[in-house]
């Protein structure tokens, strides 16, 4: 029976996952998070560390937006996976305005 305790310890260790958060500037920040912890915790910690507002940026994994309630387990994330961070764009671009204005 005493052999089961180390197995529990291994299970606890496997409950954590190391994730990388990659910014558009090439910076990478690493986080260790439990597989069933909402990613909002990681997102808020990243914003605090980088001096950003949650309203300024968007997080994506495998090209799909991440919701604050998503967990690594739900998104089937694996150890050392990368989350991409993008600054939210506000308004239209000059090119789009020019194209729309020209009737194209």
UniProtKB/Swiss-Prot annotation:
PROSITE patterns: UBIQUITIN_2. Keywords: Cytoplasm, Isopeptide bond, Nucleus, Ubl conjugation, Ubl conjugation pathway. There is a cross-link at residue 11 (Glycyl lysine isopeptide (Lys-Gly) (interchain with G-Cter in SUMO)). Residues 15-92 form the Ubiquitin-like domain. GO terms for biological process: protein sumoylation. It comes from the Eukaryota. Pfam families: Rad60-SLD (PF11976). The keyword Nucleus applies. There is a cross-link at residue 92 (Glycyl lysine isopeptide (Gly-Lys) (interchain with K-? in acceptor proteins)). Belongs to the ubiquitin family. SUMO subfamily. This is Small ubiquitin-related modifier 3. It comes from Bos taurus. The lineage of its organism: Eukaryota, Metazoa, Chordata, Craniata, Vertebrata.
């Amino acid at each position: 029976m005493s052999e089961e305790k180390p197995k529990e310890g291994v299970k606890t260790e496997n409950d954590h996952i190391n994730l990388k958060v990659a910014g558009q500037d090439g910076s990478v920040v690493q986080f260790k998070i439990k597989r069933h912890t909402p990613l909002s915790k990681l997102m808020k910690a990243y914003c605090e560390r980088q001096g950003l507002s949650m309203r300024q940026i968007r997080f994506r994994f495998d090209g799909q937006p991440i919701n604050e309630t998503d967990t690594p387990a739900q998104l089937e994330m694996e150890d050392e996976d990368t989350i991409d961070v993008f600054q939210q764009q506000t308004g239209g671009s000059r090119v789009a305005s020019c194209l729309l204005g020209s009737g194209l």
